[in-house]
C-alpha cells in the first residue's frame, strides 16, 4: 500500500483532492477520522468534548508523532487491501517522518500565495481589513508552529494553485496520476 | 524600488535567476555581498576569517533579523536608482518580515523534491549512499532551522523545478516578468 499525504497552508485548495479521490476510487483518511475512530475505540460517544480530549490524550501518549501513530494503525486496520490511501491534513514533519519510516508515503504540497489564500478565505479582495488579515496570519502561524513549513518545503510534489482553478485541478490530477501510475 | 527575494532549498535551482537578471539588466545582491561590504566598511581586508567574524557580529547586533538590516542599508546606499533589485539567499522569515516592513519585497520560491535535489547535488541517482544522504539531510536541516520552510510556504510566487530545465527557466522567467511588469 502507498500513502499519499496532502498538505498546504490554509486556503491553498487541498480539498480539490476529494473529487480526484472519488474519480479514481481512492480512500481519503483525514486526521479527524483517526481521532474519531480512537474516541469510539475507547467506548466514548462521539461529541466535540470527547473527540477533543482524545486528541489531547493522543498527543500526550505519542508526543510530536501524534496523530501519525494511530493514523497508521487506522489505515492498516481498515484499508489493508487498498493500493492507495490519501491522508488529508498532514502538517507536522514529525508525523511525516514517522509514517515514512513505517510505510511508503508521497507528499503532495499545494501552494498559493498568502494574498491569494487570504482573498479566498475572506471572500474579499482587500488586505486592509486588518482584523481579518491578523486572524489569517495567526492561523498561518499556528500551522507553521506545527512545522507545516518543513512538510511543504520537503514535499515530493508541489502543485501551484494561483490562477485558473481548472488548470490547478488538472495539474493536481497529473501529479496524482504519476503517483498512482495511471496514464 | 521593488526587491525580489529568491529562496529555495539547496539544489532547487536558485542560480537560474542569475541569467535572467543579466537578460533583464537587474542587479543581484547576495547576502554574502552584504557581509563583504560590511567587512570593508569596518576597514578590514576581505579574507574568510574577517568575513566570518563580520557575519557573527551582525547576528550579535541585529539578532534574527541579520542580515536583513545591513542588506537593506546596502541596497539603499548602492542601488537607490534601480527599479528592481534581486536578493539572493533569503532563508529566514525574520529577514523577510523585516524587509517587508521597510520596503516592497516579493518572494519567489523554487521547489524541487528532496530526491531530485539530492540527485543534483550528489551527481548520483542512488539514495543508498547513506553517508551522502545524511550530509544532504543535515544541510536541509540547517536551512530549515533558519526558518526557510516558513519563507517558502509563505512565498508570493512558487516555481517548480522538477522536470525539464528549460521549462523551469521558462516558468521562472514568466514569474519574473509578472513582477517587473514586462510582457
UniProtKB/Swiss-Prot annotation, chains A, B:
List, in alphabetical order, the Gene Ontology terms for molecular function in this entry: ATP binding
**Annotated InterPro entries:** NTP_hydrolase-rel, P-loop_NTPase
Keyword hit for Secreted:
no
Q: Which positions are tagged coiled coil?
A: none
Question: Which keywords has UniProt assigned to this entry?
Answer: ATP-binding, Nucleotide-binding
**Amino-acid positions noted as binding ATP in the UniProt annotation, renumbered to this chain:** 8-15
**Keyword ATP-binding assigned:** yes
Which family does the entry's similarity section mention? Belongs to the UPF0200 family.
This protein's name: UPF0200 protein MMP1282
Provide the species name.
Answer: Methanococcus maripaludis (strain DSM 14266 / JCM 13030 / NBRC 101832 / S2 / LL)
Amino acid at each position: 500500500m502507498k500513502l499519499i499525504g496532502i498538505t498546504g497552508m490554509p486556503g491553498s485548495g487541498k480539498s480539490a483532492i476529494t473529487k480526484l479521490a472519488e474519480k479514481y476510487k481512492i480512500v481519503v483518511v483525514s486526521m479527524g477520522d483517526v481521532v474519531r475512530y480512537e474516541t469510539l475505540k475507547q467506548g466514548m460517544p462521539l461529541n466535540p468534548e470527547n473527540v477533543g480530549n482524545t486528541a489531547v490524550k493522543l498527543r500526550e501518549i505519542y508526543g510530536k508523532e501524534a496523530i501519525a501513530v494511530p493514523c497508521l494503525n487506522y489505515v492498516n486496520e481498515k484499508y489493508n487491501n487498498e493500493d492507495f490511501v490519501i491522508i488529508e491534513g498532514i502538517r507536522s514533519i514529525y508525523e511525516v517522518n514517522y509514517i515514512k519510516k513505517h510505510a511508503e508515503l508521497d507528499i503532495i504540497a499545494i501552494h498559493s500565495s498568502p494574498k491569494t489564500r487570504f482573498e479566498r478565505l475572506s471572500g474579499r479582495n482587500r488586505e486592509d481589513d486588518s482584523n481579518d488579515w491578523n486572524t489569517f496570519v495567526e492561523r498561518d502561524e499556528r500551522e507553521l508552529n506545527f512545522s507545516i513549513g518543513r512538510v511543504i518545503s520537503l514535499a515530493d510534489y508541489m502543485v501551484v494553485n494561483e490562477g485558473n482553478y481548472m488548470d490547478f485541478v488538472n495539474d493536481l490530477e497529473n501529479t496524482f496520476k504519476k503517483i498512482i501510475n495511471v496514464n
